[in-house]
Amino acid sequence: MGEALAPKGIDFVDAPVMGSPSGVGSWAFALGGSDEALAKIKDVLLVLSGSEEKLFHIGPLGHGNKLKLLNNMMLGAIDACAAETMALAEHMGLSQKTLIDVAVAANARVLSNAYKEIGTRIAEGRYDEPTFTVDMLIKDNKLCLDMAREYGAPLILGAAVDYVHRMVSVQGYGAKDHAVSWKAVAKNWKA
């Protein structure tokens, strides 16, 4: 799109948001485009990010989106891990809320706040007001896997993450928040 707009004197950048809707005002941005084009929108980005430290100029047009896909693959991996551990906790008669409380207080916090957010949504059963749907995650997983193949670097763990989320969607949870993934994992064990 940037190439089509350039002859008309229109600048274009890719500036995907890195964060959930609850983080508005503190989002990070992976920015792709020219220095000149980014300078024109910097004030808007500062309002959305809250600080210059959250604005990352990744490279030319398209590179911001590439980094976003990698970021979402990491989110998907954390989601798949949370799905399995939360399903196993329930299967063994353990409290999902207690698992999250202990994991966040212990070393699982190194996984980021995503684990805490996903785990909390699971423990509270909040899936109907999605911050990011299972099907959206599948779309980004596919784009990331395709991108990796184009670079001659197939992702083994990424393919497993994609498999988990496709299984979740096939079970009818595609439009739900991705935190619902644990239910699909648990259904497979109870079958």
Residue ranges and their predicted role:
Residues H63-W189:
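Helical "substrate-binding/catalytic lid" subdomain
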Residues K8, K190-A191:
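Eukaryotic N-terminal targeting leaders
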Residues M1-M73:
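Rossmann-fold dinucleotide-binding core
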